[in-house]
From Swiss-Prot:
Binding site for ADP: T12, R16, T265, G308, G408, N412
Species the sequence originates in: Marinobacter nauticus (strain ATCC 700491 / DSM 11845 / VT8) (Marinobacter aquaeolei)
Stated name of the protein: Glycerol kinase
Transmembrane annotation, as ranges: none
GO biological process terms held by the UniProt record: glycerol catabolic process; glycerol metabolic process; glycerol-3-phosphate metabolic process
Residues reported to bind glycerol: R82, E83, Y134, D243, Q244
Length: 493
């Protein structure tokens, strides 16, 4: 029996493919960037055909790099940028418009009107999401209303909608299968996370014809066989999950109270709440963590707009550092008791503040303040914002006992220690940092028998380093109080 798994990791700026073995070890990788389109202010688009072409290219390259044949694969897992919306012609397979990306804000005014008309409570109750351009529903309606004849063709069943996973599945299987998984469906604002069905009332609210929608499967399932000409053999696509959900799986956060936080340009914190779909009273999102054997596991999620991007700004905008690794050296000279606060609200503040009008600020400056203090404040801002999320999660009644971290900033020991100190929980950094792709491989492996159980996957997770809290409670409280004061000033500017 073959023990290799191919993970497709289709992201916002690049498509990647990674081959893993049956121990979760990386065997080969390939990556290719693709174009971003910004036709108007606040609009972000992708060419869906370019996404497909780049994905196929990296799959072939990864197999070639690892000297592995497609016939050596037990299965394929797909993980993807969430919410991004593609609509295509079922007969020709051609998109009728560029894909509208999750970052796109073109439907903001309609979302505002829907909220003002009192519809948000329905959306929160059924989907766990807020009414926001971020999610797929209003993007779908925009395409139907702005491409000639699209709405009529959609109602006649001639068109198909999909998030990126569905689009890739359609192409990999030669147009035979129009399917998605429960995690991606849960990000559309059209899927009832309690009934695990597309919701007729939400379809009516957002004016989306049911004929457009894919069939919803478990996250580990037989989605369909690839066409032989794609990779050289027919391979079962056996797992699908949105990127943050796949990272939760890759981090083996399978028990309620387990959480992972991914530190890239921004930050996504997701906490497993088990069989309970916990409704947030603090404007966090409730989502499907994954669905296995027909049983959904739920999570609560908070997002920070600026994490690693704060260090990019200090490097490229202010030129205070020439490389991100210098930041830890500066922080070591300043220490944790830094009176300077950097609130990186460059595009407003995300969860739990949700203030689009907030703008960035550096507070606490004195004549003694130098580059080191400002750089350290940038690092600390990531940890303070994470504490904002954790506090909101706890206020919603969820437990958070430890935090597993991944992403670019997770390699910074100083930041991870300060994160543990300010949260007052252990912070665990895994040996394998490619957690998103690994999660997709795990799902495919569960379905194809490479992995027997979640317990086996849990046994494969290894901690490279655990950071434990080592800060006096009084200092922790005073530092965080200073942060809250800084945020209040920014929000009330």
């Amino acid at each position: 029996m073959s023990r290799y798994l191919l993970a497709i990791d289709q992201g916002t700026t690049s498509s990647r493919a990674i081959v893993f073995d049956d121990k979760g070890a990386q065997v080969a990788v390939a990556q290719q960037e693709f174009h971003q389109y910004f036709p108007k202010d606040g609009w972000v688009e992708h060419d869906a055909m370019e996404i497909w072409d780049s994905t196929l290219a990296v799959c072939r390259a990864a197999l070639n790099n690892g000297k592995i044949k497609a016939s050596d694969l037990a299965g394929i897992g797909i993980t993807n940028q969430r919410e991004t919306t593609v609509i295509w012609d079922r007969a020709t397979g051609q998109p009728i418009h560029h894909a509208i990306v999750w970052q796109d804000r073109r439907t903001a005014s309609w979302c505002t009107k829907l909220r003002q008309d009192g519809h948000e409570s329905l959306v929160v109750d059924r989907t766990g999401l807020l009414i926001d351009p971020y999610f797929s529903a209003t993007k779908i309606a925009w395409i139907l209303d702005n491409v000639d004849g699209a709405r009529q063709r959609a109602e006649a069943g001639e068109l198909a909608f999909g998030t990126i996973d569905t689009w890739l599945l359609w192409n990999l299987t030669g147009g035979k299968h129009h399917r998605t998984d429960a995690t991606n469906a849960s990000r559309t604002a059209l899927f009832n996370i309690h009934t695990q069905q597309w919701d007729p009332q939400l379809l009516k609210l957002f004016r989306v014809p049911a004929a457009l929608l894919p069939e919803v499967f478990d996250s580990a399932a037989e989605y369909g066989l690839t066409e032989p000409e794609c990779l050289g053999a027919s391979v079962m696509i056996a797992g699908i999950a949105g990127d943050q959900h796949a990272a939760l799986i890759g981090q083996a956060c399978f028990e309620p109270g387990m959480a992972k936080s991914t530190y890239g340009t921004g930050c996504f914190l997701m906490l497993n709440t088990g069989q309970q779909a916990l409704r947030s009273e603090n404007r966090l999102l409730t989502t499907v963590a994954y669905r296995l054997n027909g049983k959904p596991c739920y999570a609560i999620e908070g997002s920070i707009f600026v994490a690693g991007a704060a260090m990019q700004w200090l490097r490229d905008g202010l030129r205070l550092i020439s490389h991100a690794r210098e930041s830890a050296e500066h922080a070591a000279t300043v220490g944790v008791n830094n009176p300077v606060y950097l609130v990186p609200a460059f595009t407003g503040l995300g969860a739990p503040h949700w203030d689009p009008n907030a703008r960035g600020a550096i507070l606490g400056l004195t004549r003694d303040t130098g580059i080191a203090e400002i750089v350290t404040a940038g690092l600390q801002s990531v940890c303070y914002q994470t504490k904002d999320l954790v506090r909101a999660i706890r206020n919603d009644g969820a437990r958070l006992e430890s935090l597993r971290v991944d992403g670019g900033m997770a390699v910074n020991d100083w930041v991870m220690q300060f994160l543990s100190d300010i949260l007052n929980v252990p912070v665990d950094r895994p040996s394998v940092t490619e957690t998103t792709a690994l999660g997709a491989a795990y799902l495919a492996g569960l379905q194809t028998g490479v992995f027997d159980s979640l317990e086996q996957i849990t046994s494969l997770w290894e901690c490279e380093h655990q950071f434990r809290p080592d800060m006096a409670p009084g200092l922790r409280e005073s530092l965080y109080a200073g942060w809250l004061d800084a945020v209040e000033r920014v929000c009330n500017h």
